[in-house]
Amino acid sequence: MNKRKINNKVLLIIDIVLLVISIFTYKYIFEVESLKKIYSEQTSRFIEDNENPVFRIGKIILYSSANAVDKSNGELKDLDISQFTDLEIYIDNKVKSEEITAENTINQMYINNIKIESKNNSGEKILNYKNPLECGKYVELDNWKDDGILFNIINTNEKNEQADYNNSIFYTDCSNPISLGYINKNILIGCEVGEEAGTIVFDGTILKNARIDLEKLEAKISFSINIINNYNEKFVCNLEIENNLESEGEGIYSGYLIKVLNPEEDQYNFIKISD
């Protein structure tokens, strides 16, 4: 009799253990399947959102030249030489819709994850916003701050009337390019240019006169452009731009160099990362 009671207790305990295991197994399987479903839905939505992007980079214009500061009272015996490249980045916000909407207009924009890689450590590498009205001219710039480059968005007539292009501004409808300036400052200090060089102009020709190897000035400029639209949705585009100063002919040695980059379709789409 006692043996039967013990067996019954053992069977009851086994049944309880099996029940608990079954519950946890079902819960695990249910959670895994739920996560799979959520992941699948999110993936499908991500693909759908980015197959027809709201924003993309439509065009990039690079203007490169050089400048020198003469510290020898015009005798060209003590020149500090710098190279600069202006970047005009155009955002196309009419891929998905030709109409101006809350979805394809900008409420906030900033640039971060800025990185400049160069084959040469000479000079101070600087990147920051540049007044677009100064494009093509050498202008001293401060380097970017730790938090990147924050843009003031022009979205009213009043702000438009008060717009100061010396500050980092961008129009909500993407009607102006993102204007940036890159400077490789003081790549050569205390340089003397001989009379055999002839007439000296402080532009890209000064690099040739100073015998500066263009290959050593090549740089890879990369950064992320972050956009928040007027639906409060966030988008990001990671750019990588090669600052190559050579081209057919003399390149920047001829005085200046203009390059127009037309990215391939889907190369620089803004990826939607949050609703």
Each language-model region and where it sits:
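Non-catalytic macromolecular-recognition regions in eukaryotic signaling proteins
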Residues: 29-217, 231-275
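Hydrophobic alpha-helical membrane-insertion segments, chiefly the h-region
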Residues: 18-28
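N-terminal Sec-pathway targeting helices
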Residues: 2-18
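Short, structured surface segments that line ligand/substrate-binding pockets
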Residues: 220-227
